[in-house]
């Protein structure tokens, strides 16, 4: 589960700027 949480954070850093 911890790995999944880190994956979500990693994806958020990528998609965050894209959405902005």
UniProtKB/Swiss-Prot annotation:
Transmembrane regions listed in the UniProt entry: none
Enzyme class: translocase
UniProt KW Ion transport keyword: yes
Catalytic activity from the UniProt record: ATP + H2O + 4 H(+)(in) = ADP + phosphate + 5 H(+)(out)
Membrane topology, from the record: Peripheral membrane protein
Major localization listed first in the record, in broad terms: plastid
Annotated localization: Plastid, Chloroplast thylakoid membrane
Annotated spans, Disordered: 1-20
EC number in record: 7.1.2.2
Compositionally biased spans, kind Polar residues: 1-10
GO BP: any one term: ATP biosynthetic process
Induction: Expression shows a diurnal pattern of oscillation across the 24-hour light-dark, with increased levels during the light period (at protein level).
Keywords: ATP synthesis, Chloroplast, Hydrogen ion transport, Ion transport, Membrane, Plastid, Thylakoid, Translocase, Transport
Family named by the database record: Belongs to the ATPase alpha/beta chains family.
Record's function text: Produces ATP from ADP in the presence of a proton gradient across the membrane. The catalytic sites are hosted primarily by the beta subunits.
Name the UniProt record assigns to this protein: ATP synthase subunit beta, chloroplastic
Organism encoding this protein: Chattonella marina var. antiqua
């Amino acid at each position: 589960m911890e790995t999944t949480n880190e994956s979500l954070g990693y994806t958020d850093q990528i998609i965050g700027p894209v959405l902005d």
